Amino acid sequence: MEYKTPFIAKKLGVSPKAVVRIAQQLNLTIEKNKYGHFIFTQEDVDQMLEHHRFQIEQSQNSQSTQKASSNEVEELKTQVNTIVQNISSNDFEQLANQLNTITRRLDRMEEQMQDKANDVVTYQLLQHRREMEEMLERIQKLEAALTKEEPIYITPDSKPTYEREKKPKRRKMIFSIFGL
């Protein structure tokens, strides 16, 4: 008997693409009918069912090993907690003191970095101010040189240029037709 991909997919509980993938993994010879549909034999279906059941069993076994590993993690956590509780209070105080000294050093270093950043910014501002003053001096010197060299006489026009230009008068249409 011949079976098509959708029937096998329903039987296995997977998608039709998964059926084709399983057939390729098992190196089954897959035939196609004249419409391009895959056709499987009863032997192919049996092999795919066995393979699928085997994969399901493996996934269940891996889940049980994951549960066992999570139990081991919980045991390790309890061991760490007991070790931490067994540490003497003297050791705890020493660790707290070391932590305090480290935080103080970090605070001092942050303040020093902030001071250096402020110094750099003020230096840059002073440099920019000095450059601006030099530019102002140059501009003033150029203005003085221009006033000495070339006296500029600007006479305001009584009318703007667009009003001064006279537009040619248009002749009347009748005159232009007769050439007058």
Swiss-Prot record:
Which positions make up the DNA-binding region?
5-25
**Which InterPro entries does the record match to this protein?**
Chrosome_anchoring_RacA (IPR023522)
Return one GO MF term: double-stranded DNA binding
UniProtKB keywords: Cell cycle, Cell division, Chromosome partition, Coiled coil, Cytoplasm, DNA-binding, Sporulation
What do the Gene Ontology cellular component annotations say? cytoplasm
Coiled-coil intervals in this record? 67-151
What's the superkingdom here? Answer: Bacteria
Sorted alphabetically, the Gene Ontology BP terms of this entry are: asymmetric cell division; chromosome condensation; chromosome segregation; sporulation resulting in formation of a cellular spore
The subcellular localization recorded is: Cytoplasm
Q: Return the NCBIfam families for the record.
A: PRK13182.1-1
| Family (UniProt) | Belongs to the RacA family.
What this protein is reported to do is described as: Required for the formation of axial filaments and for anchoring the origin regions at the cell poles in sporulating cells, thus ensuring proper chromosome segregation in the prespore. Binds in a dispersed manner throughout the chromosome but preferentially to sites clustered in the origin portion of the chromosome, causing condensation of the chromosome and its remodeling into an elongated, anchored structure.
Q: What is this protein called?
A: Chromosome-anchoring protein RacA
What is the organism field in this record? Bacillus cereus (strain ATCC 14579 / DSM 31 / CCUG 7414 / JCM 2152 / NBRC 15305 / NCIMB 9373 / NCTC 2599 / NRRL B-3711)
Q: Which gene encodes it?
A: racA
